[in-house]
Amino acid sequence: MDNLSSVIKTVYYYPLKNTGWTNILVYKIILALQGSRFMKFIQKKLIDRYIQEALEIPAYITISEENGGEIPIINKQTFHMRFGVKGRIPMGSSVKDFDILQTSGSTSGIPSKIPISDIDVVRLRNYYINLAKIAGDDVMPQIYRYVNMFPTSDSSTGRFSELLVPEEYRLERSNADPDRTLQIIDKAIFDNYVSEDVPLIVGGLPILHLMFLEKLQDGNEVSDYLKFNGICLYGGESPTIFERLKLYQYYHKLIGIYGSTEMGPKLGFAVEPNLIIDIALTIPEIALEITGTSDQPTSFFYDKYLHHFEIIDDSLINTPLIQQAEIKIRWDQEDKSKLVDPMHLKNILFEYRHLIQEKIKSMGKNNINLLQKIMNDMFYTNFYNKLFKYYGLVMLYGRDGIIFGGANLDSKFVEIILEKLKDESLPINYLAIHRNNFMEQSKDSSEFSESSEFSESSEDNIGISNYSGLTLNILVETSTELNKSELLELKTHIIQQMEHQHHDFEQIMLAYKAKDQDDLILDNIKLWAFNSQESPMHDRYIKSGKRIYVIKKMDDMFVEQSYLVV
């Protein structure tokens, strides 16, 4: 390693060494220089150094030898599933030197193990403290109290959701228990441990926030405090726009975290302006001008200090500029994405502001004032200037699979389930899955809609019983027509196979069974049965010549051709 790259790395990592004024100053300078020729040179030198370091690690040595000395794009299959932890850490180090996180195992259903070090945790904790000092209320407060609703687990979310918060800020961990969360907050208010000057961050999966809100009573001390001083921090999956607005009605502020077990909870963050951005991108002409497609993404700001993002074949490829214990070179997040210049986007949204205002007016009376204030702050004040000036913006269009309760269910997973069902000689020709999104469906009605149109009735009906992240359609093409009881038995068997095959899916089901709420989950999982001659999946196979295991959009054809839904 040359001396220059060593000096560059030392200076570049300095903002994460501590949280003092000099660390903040260096971070500010790095942010201000983003996009300059000098900073591009610095970041290239860092990446070159990481490549040299990677080529001293057994897994990368093997991969580069197989690819003519180059490191290709890598992912879970080619890196984690192929090499054990020992092969992915520097030679001479021991697995015992690291803590181990577990991935969701979305492709094989079997979790892979990710090593992290103590310094990884310290750096990430310092990063969020320094981010708060730089961005201020644009992102998060500097001093706060924290209640952790995320379930305790060895996943990235389970571990980092606690470790990243300074110990003196933590109240207590409720471990996915909304009742306990309410008790913790109530006691903190009674003991004057939180106040108007000290906001409270409540962290958890979106479904846990919705469950918690159902415990609140309007006008009591807890609900009043949260409305003026509460911050809703959610992660693990992205709720719909309406679900985010539902949360925003009860909290003073929203913070969404985009992350992964492999990279940690630092890939991106969503705050109030992301609501306006995402709403604007539901308007086709705005989406087309900004992204070149009318598809509707979810937006996140990201820190160019932390990441070198590229889009290759529509997928988000990341070589972190701040590496963790396990070095990642050209890591495929396997998220279909686009990168957008925030200032360019802001200017376009300003041009279309009247169209966005009309859209906002259709989103329910409880949301209009909230959204109008965010929009005014975006366009007519300096409140969010640092966000749009210093940070990047990534548009996420989803993965190959679908997210169910935080578990990613992808095509390979569904294919494995289908093969296992066929091995049991069950009367199934084909299997696919689909996630609802404000879908209205009925076998007794010809109406079937799946859209992002907003209405006050949609706003009022949002709750845990119809949360989008816990809705799932299982589509089966049967070789013989089955009756209702046979299909119910088949549905139960398929769900059991999914639990057995997918670690995260199993944990979700176990968590709700433990709370005697498994009926809530099962009611939101529908099995659609199709005759082999009239199946839309069969039609797609005939036309394309390939099996499609994840259906992104269901239309009237599915209602018309399904012979039973249970």
Swiss-Prot record:
Source organism, top-level taxon: Viruses
Protein name, per record: Uncharacterized protein L152
